[in-house]
Amino acid sequence: MHALLRRVTRGNGFYIGDLFHAAAGHDATTPVTLDQPLQYAPELGTRFTVGQLAEQTDELAARLWAAGVRPTERVALYKKDNFDIALHACAAARIGAVPALLSPALEAPVVRTLLDRLDGPWLLTDATTLAGPLGTVLAPASVRAVLLTTGTPAEGALPAAGATGPAREGDAPPPAPVVRLADHRGAPKRPPVFLHPRQPSLITHSSGTTGVPKLAVHCPEAGWHRLVPQKVVSWPIRGKEKAALCMTFVHSRFYQGLAMFLSHGNPMLIAVDPDPSRIGPLFARERPGYIETHPNTYVDWEALADAPGEPLAGVRVFGATFDAMHPRTIQRMLGASRRTRPLFVQFYGQSEIGPMAGRWYTRRSAARMNGRCVGLPLPGFISLRVVDDAGKRLRGGRTGHLEVRSRTRILTYLGEDQRYAEQLHDGWWRVGDMGRRDRWGLLHLLDREVDRIGDLESSLAVEDLLMSRLEELREVVLVPGADGEPVPVVATVDESPLDAARWQRATSDLPTMAPVRQFRFEDLPRTSTRKIQKPELARLIQGVRATDQGVGA
């Protein structure tokens, strides 16, 4: 079936360089509102049309071409968090370059490692970022040139273009030149370049929950196959509801979400800052009918359910595509909407594959939901099986490794082809999660393979229960202790001490665990999508075990 559909749909591609132009071709007046001005052009304000954003994409593409960027060349983007990350990525893709999106949350040494894997890319950043830790880790030959979106090179950071002088025999490689893109303002407009559908067109990185992130190489064809089922699901609200996206601009999901609603002609609201104190008034003013953010951000947005102005009252559909959501959070989101029949649509996926399974919830079904059930594999796009350690398919109801076959898979891990190949078994991709299928074919996600703790069937299920039983929890995760025992780590909504008696009652019927550890929420190690880095947290727990002050068993 997959081979047949691949032949039928061959030649289709998803090109982020054409996002705003394609939307403008349908209706150039469709509004797009930002929560913050563009960093490189704050004078333009926060209200645009898709036609104006297409013009901005053309302007930035012309600047990149004038600076020397050419088709198939890699452009690493690592800068202050702002929607202009997306615009510069679209601009690079517009001229056929390959944007490599690096999260602003990554530490400079990790960025240096990823730049080395990118093998001498152009580096697009801003002067403030360059003058910070990034400038101290850049090796002379680690990048082809530095392209500044704003500001000028800080004195002593890196020399300006042409300031290095003639090379002499035996000299070390000269530092990379620094180019201000603003110096190429008004450069001639360039025609679009569309790479082959199976050619690398975008590079993103994995969450990095287990260490240095992997660089995922995407192609237009796989992106197109990811987008099709999402456009089908969003069809009922096409052109009607204002769609609000608040997620990292360095994940492929953002561009899929953008394309999904731009192609439908929906007005859009794009936010950088997820803080409830700021996103609440924004939603109360703009009244989105669709919102999507990271699962952990939704937990913070539970505070919006009772916020002044009822910021979630107009939401018809809540969307989530990164990880399984806590039932408590879904219930509170749906309860905060004043629409007649609001829905929470949840997809389970990963960077390497995109959405793999999905389902939706109403207020009634959410009240009795099982947080580990992530729905049915997407028919026609995803084939999913559960296998044992030897790769043998397991019957329904048995727990094993999840593997998928699809047309949505990335091409490789850049610089780690062998690591990529090790996850393929006769065309089946080892997802890295443990789960099972029930009698109806529904997928139940139990744990990441690397996060399994002893004989505990599912640490995620325990976390769901604790979040539902203790409304004061903002975060709870289970990690292995020094002796392999489950250690619960929590953070509370207001950083108040966890009540030992309430914890005891909430855990009385759960598997035996070590004493609970309470952290400040901001001290928990996280990824760019706000997921907890469990291996790092486990190392932290084990390293400070001797000074632990537990709350209770």
Curated annotation (Swiss-Prot):
The keyword Nucleotide-binding applies. Changing residue 352 to A: Loss of activity, cannot form cremeomycin. Residues 157-178 are annotated as: Disordered. It catalyses: 3-amino-2-hydroxy-4-methoxybenzoate + nitrite + ATP = cremeomycin + AMP + diphosphate + H2O. InterPro entries: AMP-binding_CS, AMP-dep_synth/lig_dom, ANL_N_sf, ATP-dep_AMP-bd_enzyme. Its EC number is 6.7.1.1. SUPFAM superfamilies: Acetyl-CoA synthetase-like. GO terms for biological process: antibiotic biosynthetic process. The keyword Ubl conjugation does not apply. It comes from the Bacteria. Signal peptide: none annotated. Residues 157-167 have a biased composition (Low complexity). Transmembrane segments: none annotated. Keywords: Antibiotic biosynthesis, ATP-binding, Ligase, Nucleotide-binding. Pathway: Antibiotic biosynthesis. It is an enzyme of class 6 (ligase). One of its GO terms (molecular function) is ligase activity. Belongs to the ATP-dependent AMP-binding enzyme family. Part of a gene cluster involved in the biosynthesis of cremeomycin, a light-sensitive o-diazoquinone with antibacterial and antiproliferative effects. Catalyzes the last step of cremeomycin biosynthesis, the diazotization of 3-amino-2-hydroxy-4-methoxybenzoate (3,2,4-AHMBA) with nitrite to generate cremeomycin. This is 3-amino-2-hydroxy-4-methoxybenzoate diazotase. It comes from Streptomyces cremeus. The lineage of its organism: Bacteria, Bacillati, Actinomycetota, Actinomycetes, Kitasatosporales.
